[in-house]
Amino acid sequence: MAGKSPEEQHPVKAYGWAARDSSGILSPFKFSRRATGDHDVRVKILYAGVCHSDLQSARNEMGCFTYPLVPGFETVGIATEVGSKVTKMKVGDKVAVGIMVGSCGKCDDCVNDRECYCPEVITSYGRIDHDGTPTYGGFSNETVANEKFVFRFPEKLPMAAGAPLLNAGVSVYSPMRFYGLDKPGMHLGVVGLGGLGHLAVKFAKAFGVKVTVISTSSIKKGEAINDLGADAFLVSTDAKQMQAGSGTLDGILDTVPVVHPIEPLLGLLKNHTKLVLVGATMGSFELPILPLGVGRKSVASTVGGSTTEAQEMLDFAAEHNITANVEIIPMDYINTAMERIEKNDVRYRFVIDVGNTLTPPES
């Protein structure tokens, strides 16, 4: 690519919605995608999930992004072109792109199928790709990525309700598998019942795990038990309920994306077990050491999942009919959707109908 102009490197005209500054407000945006390389898959985007991370990123709350920024970590569509050396898929296949579009391929994490922990991981938006240009996410008409980071989307899964699996799904599936919280008969606590939390309940039940949902309010009790199949519900602000649940859980998956007290949660764990934080937040938690030490309990965290885990998760979801509960929205509703996400006013995930509602900018 050396010596080539940006237009030569990225000859394919594309469009989407982008944030231009830390207000996070999105508006129509024209840009370009690279030509399809030998190992690339070009994707016509039909649906894109919207997550709390998109809101944080659009506002650059993590302090690591540049503008303009096209969000979208949960992308589903149709393969429209494949490179000459692509072996996993063909034109016309249903495919998906998740959190990553690249990594170094050489570090310990990459060679051991843990690309999401590569120090040079390239996320689907807001990062610099191997050719030195910015990556743009799924709030757009099309994308192109190396086949390693493009997944076969099972025919059995509905595309709209399946889109959130690409981030929210793998973000709960991966820690359950890695930390052994997927064993039938185990008792798992799920903190928070949002985009990640409701999928955590669904995956856990499919694994044969007993699930207790933990929330700050009783409002979601009916949804948790009657709609999602949870076995029990605890209100974390109710001291009597928390005391009754003391020492009953084999593990906790905490999906809340903001800072909150974790000491009360540690009391729910059996000795020698884990609290796993998966809610993306830039804040710092107060970690009480004594409650950990006396029960040899531990606190861990994960981010996303590997490419192998993502494909495995999609196939498992198809086998067990696991999809997200979604509200499908048009592209021009995205700023209202972001406001509602901030207010926790969604059950449980917004998905943009990109294929039918995204139109090219007028100028």
Curated annotation (Swiss-Prot):
Residues annotated as domain Enoyl reductase (ER): 24-352
EC number(s) recorded for this UniProt protein: 1.3.1.73, 1.5.1.-
A GO term, aspect molecular function: oxidoreductase activity, acting on the CH-OH group of donors, NAD or NADP as acceptor
Residues annotated as binding NADP(+): S53, L193, G195, L196, S215, T216, S217, K220, K221, V278, A280, T302, R349
Record: residues binding Zn(2+) 2: C104, C107, C110, C118
Binding site residues for Zn(2+) 1: C51, D54, E74
Cross-referenced SUPFAM superfamilies: GroES-like, NAD(P)-binding Rossmann-fold domains
Family matches, as InterPro entries: ADH-like_C, ADH-like_N, CAD-like, GroES-like_sf, NAD(P)-bd_dom_sf, PKS_ER
Catalysed reactions, as listed in the record: 17-O-acetylnorajmaline + NADP(+) = (2R)-1,2-dihydrovomilenine + NADPH + 2 H(+); (20S)-19,20-dihydrovomilenine + NADP(+) = vomilenine + NADPH + H(+)
Pathways per UniProt: Alkaloid biosynthesis; ajmaline biosynthesis
Top-level EC class: oxidoreductase
Location in or out of the cell: Cytoplasm
Cofactor(s) this protein cannot do without: Zn(2+)
Keyword Acyltransferase: no
Gene Ontology biological process terms from the UniProt entry: alkaloid metabolic process
Source organism, top-level taxon: Eukaryota
PANTHER family hit by this protein: ALDEHYDE REDUCTASE
Family stated for the protein in its record: Belongs to the zinc-containing alcohol dehydrogenase family. Class-P subfamily.
Function: Alcohol dehydrogenase involved in the biosynthesis of ajmaline-type monoterpenoid indole alkaloids (MIAs) natural products, important plant-derived pharmaceuticals used in the therapy of heart disorders. Catalyzes the conversion of 1,2-dihydrovomilenine to 17-O-acetylnorajmaline, an intermediate chemical in the biosynthesis of ajmaline. Also able, with a lower efficiency, to convert vomilenine into 19,20-dihydrovomilenine.
Subunit structure, as described in the record: Homodimer.
Protein name from the UniProt record: 1,2-Dihydrovomilenine reductase
